[in-house]
Amino acid sequence: MALVQAHRARRLHAEAPDSGDQPPRRRVRQQPPRAAPAPARARRRRAPAPSPGGSRAPPTSGGPPASPLLDASSKDTPAAHRPPRGTVVAPRGCGLLQVIDAATNQPLEIRYHLDLARALTRLCEVNLQELPPDLSPRELQTMDSSHLRDVVIKLRPPRADIWTLGSRGVVVRSTITPLEQPDGQGQAAEVEDHQPNPPGEGLKFPLCFLVRGRQVNLVQDVQPVHRCQYCARFYKSQHECSARRRDFYFHHINSHSSNWWREIQFFPIGSHPRTERLFVTYDVETYTWMGAFGKQLVPFMLVMKFGGDEPLVTAARDLAVDLGWDRWEQDPLTFYCITPEKMAIGRQFRTFRDHLQMLMARDLWSSFVASNPHLADWALSEHGLSSPEELTYEELKKLPSIKGTPRFLELYIVGHNINGFDEIVLAAQVINNRSEVPGPFRITRNFMPRAGKILFNDVTFALPNPRSKKRTDFLLWEQGGCDDTDFKYQYLKVMVRDTFALTHTSLRKAAQAYALPVEKGCCAYQAVNQFYMLGSYRSEADGFPIQEYWKDREEFVLNRELWKKKGQDKYDIIKETLDYCALDVQVTAELVNKLRDSYASFVRDAVGLTDASFNVFQRPTISSNSHAIFRQIVFRAEQPARSNLGPDLLAPSHELYDYVRASIRGGRCYPTYLGILREPLYVYDICGMYASALTHPMPWGPPLNPYERALAARAWQQALDLQGCKIDYFDARLLPGVFTVDADPPDETQLDPLPPFCSRKGGRLCWTNERLRGEVATSVDLVTLHNRGWRVHLVPDERTTVFPEWRCVAREYVQLNIAAKERADRDKNQTLRSIAKLLSNALYGSFATKLDNKKIVFSDQMDAATLKGITAGQVNIKSSSFLETDNLSAEVMPAFEREYSPQQLALADSDAEESEDERAPTPFYSPPSGTPGHVAYTYKPITFLDAEEGDMCLHTLERVDPLVDNDRYPSHLASFVLAWTRAFVSEWSEFLYEEDRGTPLEDRPLKSVYGDTDSLFVTERGHRLMETRGKKRIKKHGGNLVFDPERPELTWLVECETVCGACGADAYSPESVFLAPKLYALKSLHCPSCGASSKGKLRAKGHAAEGLDYDTMVKCYLADAQGEDRQRFSTSRTSLKRTLASAQPGAHPFTVTQTTLTRTLRPWKDMTLARLDEHRLLPYSESRPNPRNEEICWIEMP
């Protein structure tokens, strides 16, 4: 076919067939016109101008008359005789392929013929040869790659090269030599079988083929080319490389880096406005039972209360009555169960929860069936099922014309501090994978234990949502709202939530923080425990527990007076325990309502999301809620119009996840003075350190491609090489990034006890003044190190990440919380203040969340993808645990004893045909007792369980690939938050130690003795320096807590924590003792202004603080300093060992055992600092190296 101009104006038609031979590369030819026509236009046609008389103009001389575009005669012309119309395009003769040679990694350009038969025929004609007679062009036209070798054998070229195209543009070259065989024999005989010509009649020129899948093409030529390493474009001499193409290749095409950064998924913070909720708030009381696994805690009492939507509350109340629960006399919606029988409480609570979720699931199913009356007929006609409940979910979703309004039901099992105790104690009984719900439900489960607690234990029963569709307008999402179309399923969700995870404090303190009424008094739980263990407890004449069961005398007197006011003659310990437990449940239920209303009001008013139906219990922790609010604020500000946060805020994944995590370094915590300090000591604390750091600029935008990254890294290195010239943290020419660095410290006289960076090279995190090698640091750390006199060198690393710009991405979030906190202080709203404070401190923790490749599933909950991963070797089962079987229904055969005679014992070893004598005695019989010659066997009880192994087996799965897939958390923001805090402390160090530069460390005065993450303990000299050089950073003198982009500078404030309780002035401790990190005591606080004295401060992490005081810690230090090994100091406390899933033989899943931990109190032994003298410590340096460092270097010996 060819594009040919017609012999009349502005018409195109096909070229007439030409039977003559034409050259292989026939170009599109234009026939010479009889008369020069007007230039043709491709997209526009015009009729000739009409003549004045109204008739058409005569045809051009020398050519046929021009016909009109549409006339009556053309309509009557048969289609076969009409002239063809339109554009005719000649097919291409050759194709072009740009590939990579797998053997040499060389980029190539392969030009190949599209028509194999025609190209091979013409090639033979050019070389004056012919194709073999048994190889027809039709056979070549229909040939696929599986017959290529046979064709080559028929052609018998000297050599045939075959380029096979693989994945991602990689080709593999192979060669066939038909005249040679691997066994050394010739091919002549084999060729004769395929080709009648003599052996010498083969092709005399080599061939080259290209195999693409099953298609075979003849290669015209193969030329080496160049390939751009930044954009992957192939070129011969030069090319233009655009930044857009480089970025696209780096983030989406390059197999090595395309999965380094993932878009963060987003869904609005609000829940569906029509969600129906039921809250079951409960609490349990336990006693100690000596079992096979130690002191195991067994529940003997459970109290629960219902709340939420009125129809669901009524249904739950009626169900509790039907199942025989006792109603608490003071509240009609509170029920309880009391029994000391082991496992009885768990079984009864499990039964209630199973029946409740089944009741709600059937309610959802009934509404679905009512909305789809054609369901029953369709199930019968399509699947032959008499009941729709026999359908599976996969079958149900194929139901045509699903109708109805979707419903969303949520059942919350709520308690205070239940995830670490109550839910574990009850879990072996209440976790029931099988429930009598209709078959069409899609059942999924999210079970996640973490750090000895059940973080998630959610079950979802889902049905198809007829209104689900992909969202195109995201205006509602920007306001935090959602509607029917945003949910793929309508569902019932059963979730376990812990109010402790949302308050981070005890129930009594939480009630005070949220302005809830708190009942005075408490219960003597030690007496209750002894009562259930031994059957009695020590009491007074009226049954009231004696003083030893109470915390102290004051608590004993208070509770006795409260009981006396009730006017009861005899103390009923069980009833009193029930009342206290029920009151705790009432307070927890009120706390649930308060949290729901307060957080919803905060999101609506403070955050400004008026369309968001926010439910704080939708997410289990305060950290997850803070991260959801942050994502919503970013989505509202950026308006990405997609289901993620857009390309500007990404999450590091795979190799980059571990690389970024390496730059996350915890805070400092160590003393630089050990022993007793008898001079004034002040404690300064940074105000909202993480909140202030969050307001500072953070990296923003997709990471730069390697070309732009190299330019940015060069700009950084040039700035770092200018020694003596400080770098501004907010220099717009230097882009944010994460680098691999080497750093060398200045002279030791220029160092101080607060190093600017820390290292894990020795196995432990050490704040060190040693040289740094191969450390991963942020660009903020580069400035901090450089400004402190360190020489910093950037190490080339392909994982180095540079971002295109800075952005105060979390500033609005922090400002909202600070404004809410200030408003709460003015209005004296303790609830709002607690919420703002928690959310302000929790966001950084959500950024730093550490992910892994492990998950814990029940055996019968492994989906098809998980099973496929296990069989393919991509997932390993690290361990398996089995639950206790007491919760399962069982039939027990009691112990029994049987006696056998010697003849009967012989029958046991005989063959079957020898035992067919009917006169022989029955093998199992009971002979008279004491019969001689008989042997007695005692059989232990046998338990037959009504359960499958999937109900009891808990698997810990781990992916073989160690790389973490992350699309949730922007972990690099946590790196920069911590880097900004290190910049704060570095500036603080300048206030204290800049005047000492040049003086040897051992000759410097003592200015600070202890440093924590956000605090510093300073002496009188350090206090004076803070009041002079650091005055602008003291909160009482004014200052900002929020970074101002218009006036960029480090923004942080401190305040003196040791203040006088009488006048509010700064106070000091006249004497202190320091034993180890987080193990110190301040004897007292003295105010120099008014002379008042108050109680000191004691910190003893891991120890029972109530058993320690200042004098004990002083005695401990002196005993150790004087070498008194006989005198040992220790503290003891009761600890609960929680086991959820463990491969240890001595730990049983879902058990809580009580143990007593005894810790030795002693000064710091395994120090991460170098000792300067008897008391003073200094960070490691070149003259005082870290003894733990064992760096390995490659040295070649001559």
UniProtKB/Swiss-Prot annotation:
Enzyme Commission number: 2.7.7.7
More details: This DNA polymerase requires a protein as a primer.
Keywords: DNA replication, DNA-binding, DNA-directed DNA polymerase, Host nucleus, Nucleotidyltransferase, Transferase, Viral DNA replication
GO annotation, biological process: DNA-templated DNA replication; viral DNA strand displacement replication
Description of how the protein assembles with itself and partners: Heterodimer with the terminal protein; this heterodimer binds to bp 9 to 18 of the genome. Forms a complex with viral pTP, DBP and hosts NFIA and POU2F1/OCT1 for initiation of replication.
Annotated organism of origin: Human adenovirus C serotype 2 (HAdV-2)
Entry superkingdom: Viruses
Enzyme class: transferase
Family: Belongs to the DNA polymerase type-B family.
Disordered: annotated segments: 1-90, 179-198, 906-931
Protein name (Swiss-Prot/TrEMBL): DNA polymerase
Residue stretches of biased makeup (Low complexity): 30-40
Reported function: Eukaryotic-type DNA polymerase involved in viral genomic replication. DNA synthesis is protein primed, and acts in a strand displacement replication. Assembles in complex with viral pTP, DBP, host NFIA and host POU2F1/OCT1 on viral origin of replication. The polymerase covalently transfers dCMP onto pTP, thereby initiating complementary strand synthesis.
Catalytic activity: DNA(n) + a 2'-deoxyribonucleoside 5'-triphosphate = DNA(n+1) + diphosphate
MF (Gene Ontology): 3'-5' exonuclease activity; DNA binding; DNA-directed DNA polymerase activity; nucleotide binding
InterPro entries, sorted: DNA-dir_DNA_pol_B, DNA-dir_DNA_pol_B_adenovir, DNA-dir_DNA_pol_B_CS, DNA-dir_DNA_pol_B_mt/vir, DNA/RNA_pol_sf, DNA_pol_palm_dom_sf, RNaseH-like_sf
One term under GO cellular component: host cell nucleus
Intracellular or extracellular location(s): Host nucleus
Alphabetized Pfam families for the sequence: DNA_pol_B_2
